[in-house]
Design a protein with these regions (language model features):
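HIT superfamily nucleotide-processing domains
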Residues: 1-121
């Protein structure tokens, strides 16, 4: 269910969270329920509900977002990693503020399997 910026947990974390990396309209924070040794979330500083709304970004902003995801992994010391985006409730999205999961190191296989499962009707 889409959220409003005034009720959005990630909007609050953008404003007041413990950022591990920040630049050019994006921040990275640690996930509070990590499924890997390194589990970071990359968030745009302005509220966009989901990846479906990627057109809210200009081409230049979208390029900066992708570069920021890569820079976040590099800043965390990751050479090999996964990048995930959950889109919609059926795709596993639980917080409706666009975010990218950057996962590196050892994975908790049980949590990873649960995170990758899609809801089916």
């Amino acid at each position: 269910m889409p959220s409003q910026p005034e009720n959005c947990l990630f909007c609050r974390l953008v404003a007041d969270g413990d950022h591990v990396h920040a630049a050019d309209g994006f921040v990275a924070i640690r996930d509070i329920n990590p499924i890997a040794e390194t589990h970071l979330l990359v968030l745009p500083t302005r509220h966009v509900d989901t990846f479906r709304d990627v057109d809210a970004f200009s081409d230049e902003e979208a390029g900066r977002m992708l570069r920021f995801v890569a820079e976040t992994a590099q800043a965390a010391g990751l050479d090999d990693y996964k990048v995930l985006v959950n889109v919609g409730e059926g795709g596993g999205q639980t917080v409706f503020h666009l975010h990218w999961h950057v996962l590196g190191g050892r994975f908790d296989r049980g949590k990873l399997s649960h995170a990758l499962a899609l809801e089916t009707a």
